């Protein structure tokens, strides 16, 4: 297990408040972008996977409250602070002998990742200026873990007795998704 420090200034993207327990197996890790975790009894759903630098922090905080396998990782949208901490979660699953989590996103997200890769030098330059990231430290993600499943309007997942409703809507991006967990009365909304 190694922590990825490849994206930006650690001070800028530091912990914004730690893990919050909302009861009923619902947790939120407050980082640069919030990460929602729902313990469904038979496994965990992670909504938004954070920055590359957040991955092992997500795993550490999750493992402090649950040893269950992560069954789904939902990308709220394709920005760097929402979809790039995935690698650590996948490595944790492999190390524990758990099945690989299924990654779910809106159908526009793969096109966003493709565009990011084509325009990487430009995004590097913009982020370097916007976030004061010094030369020699990557300022934009290089590793892309694409979703296994995509959807257009709505998608419903079941995990144990828990329903995970995913809905697309225009938010900050055209690939924006929000999640509703009716049995828990919880909405995870990414950057809406």
What is each model feature region?
Residues 16-64, 178-192:
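Conserved beta-strand hairpin/beta-sheet module of binuclear metal-dependent hydrolase folds
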Residues 27, 74, 104, 149, ...:
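Hydrophobic/aromatic beta-strand patches that form the interior of the parallel beta-sheet core
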Residues 144-147, 159-163, 172-174, 181-184, ...:
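Acidic/His-rich structured neighborhood in mature extracellular/periplasmic domains
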Residues 1-20, 129-140:
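Short, basic/low-complexity N-terminal boundary segments at the transition from targeting/disordered tails
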Residues 45-48, 72-75, 166:
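Short catalytic-loop micro-motif centered on adjacent basic/acidic residues
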């Amino acid at each position: 297990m190694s922590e990825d420090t490849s994206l930006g200034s650690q001070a800028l993207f530091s912990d914004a408040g730690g893990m919050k327990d909302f009861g009923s197996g619902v947790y939120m890790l407050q980082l640069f972008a919030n990460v929602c975790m729902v313990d469904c009894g038979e496994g965990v759903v992670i909504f938004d996977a954070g920055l590359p630098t957040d991955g092992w922090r997500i795993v550490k905080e999750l493992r402090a409250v649950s040893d269950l396998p992560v069954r789904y990782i939902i990308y709220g949208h394709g920005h760097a602070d929402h979809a790039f901490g995935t690698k650590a979660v996948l490595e944790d699953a492999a190390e524990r002998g758990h099945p690989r989590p299924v990654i779910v996103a809106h159908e526009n997200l793969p096109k966003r990742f493709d565009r990011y890769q084509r325009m990487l030098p430009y995004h590097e330059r913009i982020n370097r200026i916007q976030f004061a990231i010094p030369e020699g430290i990557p300022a934009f993600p290089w590793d892309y873990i694409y979703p296994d499943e995509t959807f257009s309007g709505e998608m419903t997942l079941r995990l144990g007795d828990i329903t995970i409703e995913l809905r697309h809507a225009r938010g900050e991006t055209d690939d924006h998704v929000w999640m509703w967990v009716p049995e828990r009365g919880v909405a995870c909304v990414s950057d809406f």
